[in-house]
């Protein structure tokens, strides 16, 4: 599918972005979203049940694939980040795993590991934020800025200063809606393929 070109473009000043439409902004993440601004207090009742998301519970390209339900008193000390609808989770440790998730309709008691940066959209479409944080160039930037060999990590405050493109609000919505639709098509094709493979294996 081809799209009409914008009348004017400008250099974004960001290597992985290249040129962007002239009326777009290029901003730091922390100007469009908060980072780690809600935590579960240590004074929380020990019998309070949480739905815990560990780094291993988020898979590249799949989002949150696994959670653990347990009382706060039995949870690891890193179970602190409160997660809300529309948040984006980005792992700040072992960044090469690309553990990034757009959160949709989570339970009220969902808590993520402090190994995640929890981005909460402010002046940006939450879906567009999720897609921007999944962009190959952005993810590669996160990995490149990580420090350490066997356990590379990036400071959440540094991650929050990374640049992303910021179209107008209507464009953000249109882009996110288009990507939602195309992603759904791909997911449907993958599901059909998996079903076909399963049928072929049954016939062997």
Predicted segments with their positions:
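A short beta-sheet element
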Residues: 78-139, 153-155
């Amino acid at each position: 599918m081809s799209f009409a070109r914008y009348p004017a473009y400008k250099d974004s000043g960001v290597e992985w972005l290249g040129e962007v439409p002239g009326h777009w902004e290029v901003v730091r993440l922390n100007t469009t979203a908060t980072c780690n601004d809600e935590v579960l207090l240590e004074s929380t009742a020990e019998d309070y049940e949480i739905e815990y998301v560990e780094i291993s519970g988020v898979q590249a390209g799949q989002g949150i694939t696994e959670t653990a339900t347990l009382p706060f008193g039995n949870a690891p000390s890193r179970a602190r980040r409160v997660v809300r609808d529309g948040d984006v989770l980005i792992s700040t440790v072992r960044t090469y795993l690309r553990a990034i998730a757009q959160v949709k309709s989570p339970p009220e008691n969902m808590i993520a590991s402090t190994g995640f940066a929890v981005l909460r959209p402010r002046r940006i479409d939450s879906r567009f934020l999720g897609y921007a944080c999944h962009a190959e160039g952005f993810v590669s930037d996160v990995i490149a800025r990580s420090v350490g060999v066997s356990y590379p990590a990036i400071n959440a405050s540094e991650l929050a200063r990374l640049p992303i493109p910021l179209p107008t609000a209507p464009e953000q919505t249109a882009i996110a809606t288009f990507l939602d639709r195309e992603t759904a098509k791909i997911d449907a094709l993958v599901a059909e393929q998996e079903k076909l493979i399963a049928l072929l294996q049954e016939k062997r």
